[in-house]
Amino acid sequence: GGKVEVQLVEYTNPGDHFNKHRDTEVNPSEMTRETHRKISLTIELTDNTQYEGANLRFIEDDGKTIRPEANKGDAFIFPSWRRHQVKPLVSGVRHALVCWYHGPFWR
């Protein structure tokens, strides 16, 4: 079995964001732990009329971004190696619950 890591994320100040990243290592030489994040989950906790900006975006290999329409209660499940970001908050407050499933390395 694996373990689950959970984090409550708050975007409360204008400009709060998360730069482009992956939730796990993709280069085998960087894999120093016995397990790593395999599956990522983001659950929206705030109605999208309560904030502007702070949108989750996925980045494709060609650099294009996908912005899923997100509202309170929506969940996004994706492989932890997928690049993504959260754009800067403009106004309001956004809360999300972020979870990662840890397991053995992909083969």
Which residues make up each language-model segment?
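Catalytic core of non-heme Fe(II) oxygenases with the double-stranded beta-helix
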Residues: 1-107
